[in-house]
Amino acid sequence: MKKYLALIMALALFSCEGNKDILLPKADKTIVSDVQEHSPIYIFFKVEGKDTIADVNRKNSIVSTNWIFNIDKRLPLRLVVPELIKLQAKKEGSMHKNEAAENFFSYANDVKKTMAFLPFTKVKYVIGKPLINSIYFGKNDLLKFNSQLLKKDELQGYINNLMIEHESEIFVSFDKNLSYDEYIKNKIIMNSIKITKKGILISNLEYVF
């Protein structure tokens, strides 16, 4: 199985059919630089009349491999997440699944001029709003912890200074109208946060509403 080479810079990926293109998100940090034994999932940005559609192509996907999700950055989360839920369920429910196989989002590191990947195998998506302890990423760089407005560079310090009396789980939530590009950038921020406060856990559940 061929692998993605980190030397290749791809701001757009091309499918095998119809010369469709996908505009990838861009970021300045690489989480994972290379994924082997993979197969691709494509989610294209498609317009039909006045409607935007998430057009999924998983014809070349093999359940036993790592899946790389190549998703157009222009798509809103409200269209992307339902497709992710269906694809995760299909892979998880397959009799041929490989417990060691993971799922990754692809994006472009525009500083190093390389491809990069963000693992999300353990993420479980929920369409709805968490009741407590919620980090919320909204439009126009809005960031809140519960009702407290924050700057993104304040988030790690705020979490680690929370006053807690027992083990607490923090849930991450996103505005359903965020672009996939914004989502990936915010996911990278969350990935970089180091929790030093004993008893605080970041949940694998991600809410979209």
Task: Enumerate the predicted regions with their spans.
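C-terminal motif of bacterial Sec signal peptides marking the signal peptidase cleavage site
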Residues: 12-15
